[in-house]
Regions:
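Extracellular TM2-ECL1-early TM3 structural module of rhodopsin-like
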Residues: 1-3, 25-88, 95-108
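First transmembrane helix
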Residues: 1-22, 42, 176-182
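Hydrophobic residues within alpha-helical transmembrane segments
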Residues: 3-6, 35-38, 48, 66-69, ...
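Hydrophobic alpha-helical segments of membrane proteins
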Residues: 45, 124-131, 172-179, 209-228, ...
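Loop architecture of class A 7-transmembrane GPCRs
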Residues: 54-79, 98, 103-104, 109-115, ...
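Intrinsically disordered regulatory tails of 7TM GPCRs
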Residues: 138-139, 143, 233-237, 270-303
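Intracellular effector-coupling site of seven-transmembrane GPCRs
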Residues: 142-171, 183-222, 232, 239-243, ...
């Protein structure tokens, strides 16, 4: 967490300024980038609370309200990040596989609608948990935990619905979408002659896939086993200890995405879809969009 805070704060501050100053702020990709950068910046600014919590032997001293706010934002960052990764993947999929449709949609209201939908889904997952009651628990040795070590009653009454929704919308749906669109994108990109545009496209694909596999997948798999353990499907004491330790490690690992994401924002991503559209049109002599391609080519050349 300390490493993420040291590296992530200046990186996200620079990225946030860069994204807010870009001329194409209304473009779909930039809308998702900007939201992702805001989420990461807020998340990193709250990391000192978690750092202090772990350095004092997992003893929360900031009170219940601070526990709810920081805990809710911490876990909300997980779902918002993977949600906007999914939006970026869909955006790149449209740009690669359906470029003409993409050009009609990228300046329309659909990026804003998707962004609002992601925030609403995250709020529907996290807010009931935050407002459902205290999230700090006084344990032995006068130690207070935050967002962990809940009683069996709290787990069944409050955390089962939360975890089911988190696993569906924070894991199954996003990873299914990413797993489907990436092969389709890679197949289409493979048909394009080697150029800087192809390189940029592959970098975007590779970055999102790498961060998803390194940061998000281990946590969600561990979270699934932790969920099964709390429902007593896994009862062996040795297995429970391993799952608990792995969950701590993967929670720290998932925070790495907040200091890695600024690298994504600076990948040149403005013009490579032009090459894809021109390739699709000019490869087909009977292309019914020839007039559209000619206009688009002239526009791209002049710009």
């Amino acid at each position: 967490y300390s490493l993420v805070f040291i590296l992530g704060l200046p990186g996200n501050a620079i990225a946030l300024y860069y994204l807010s100053q870009r001329k194409q702020r209304a473009r779909s990709t930039n809308v998702y980038f900007l939201n992702l950068s805001v989420v990461d910046t807020v998340f990193i600014c709250l990391l000192p609370f978690r750092i202090y919590y772990h350095n004092t032997g997992n003893n929360w001293v900031f009170g219940d309200i601070a526990c709810r706010i920081t805990g809710g934002l911490f876990y909300g960052n997980i779902y918002l990040s993977i949600g906007f990764f999914t939006c970026i993947s869909l955006d790149r999929y449209l740009a690669v596989v359906h470029p003409l449709t993409y050009r009609r949609l990228r300046f329309s209201h659909y990026p804003l609608v998707l962004t609002i939908l992601i925030w609403m889904i995250c709020g529907a997952i996290v807010l009931p948990l935050i407002f459902g009651g205290p999230l700090n628990n006084i344990l032995e040795a006068n130690r207070t935990s935050c967002f962990e070590e809940f009683s069996p009653r709290s787990w069944h009454n409050r955390l089962v619905p939360y975890n089911v929704c988190a696993l569906i919308f924070g894991f199954l749906v996003p990873f299914t979408v990413i797993a489907i669109v990436f092969p389709l994108m890679a197949r289409k990109i493979g048909k394009i002659r080697k150029s800087i545009h192809r390189t940029v496209a592959l970098r975007i694909i590779g970055f999102i896939l790498t961060v998803s596999l390194i940061c998000f997948l281990p946590y969600n798999i561990t979270h699934l086993f932790h969920f099964l353990m709390r429902l007593q499907f896994i009862q062996k004491c040795s297995s429970s200890i391993i799952i608990y330790k792995l969950r701590r490690i993967t929670l720290a690992l998932i925070s790495l995405n907040s200091c890695l994401n600024p690298l994504l924002y600076f990948i040149p991503s403005q013009s490579w879809e032009n090459n894809i559209l021109l390739f699709i049109c000019f490869q087909n002599e009977q292309c019914r969009y020839c007039k559209c391609c000619t206009i688009f080519f002239n526009t791209a050349t002049n710009s």
